[in-house]
């Protein structure tokens, strides 16, 4: 899988699963790269590629490729760190106030 193919797939999975990720209550609402993907999709990606995919994902986040994550909180460059989205209510209120 190339970097662009992976980033396109990640964007598709984020769009598809963002609502589920925002509702997440386990682990204080935090999630890992594997949580973004559907279980079946993530299992189809060879384990040996996971760390490289994490590097690509983190770099893309820091460049603003996934604004819903970059905007949500300060992210760390390491793929295994957790990312946290703002609750939906805060997003709606914040947008209305601005």
What does each model-found stretch correspond to?
Residues 2-30, 39, 43, 62:
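Positively charged, polyanion-binding regions of nucleic-acid-associated proteins
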Residues 41-56, 69-70:
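Short, positively charged loop/turn segments that connect secondary-structure elements
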Residues 35, 55, 59-98:
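Charged low-complexity interaction tracts in eukaryotic proteins
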Residues 27, 39, 50, 75-78:
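Generic hydrophobic/packing signal
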């Amino acid at each position: 899988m190339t970097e662009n193919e992976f980033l396109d797939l990640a964007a598709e999975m984020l769009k598809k699963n963002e609502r589920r990720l925002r509702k997440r209550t386990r682990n204080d609402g935090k999630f890992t790269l594997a949580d973004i993907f559907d279980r079946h999709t993530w299992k189809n990606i060879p384990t040996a590629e996971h760390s490289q995919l994490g590097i690509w994902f983190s770099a893309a986040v820091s460049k603003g490729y996934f604004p819903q994550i970059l905007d949500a909180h300060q992210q760390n460059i390491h793929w295994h760190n957790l990312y946290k989205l703002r609750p939906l209510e805060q997003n709606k209120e914040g947008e209305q106030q601005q």
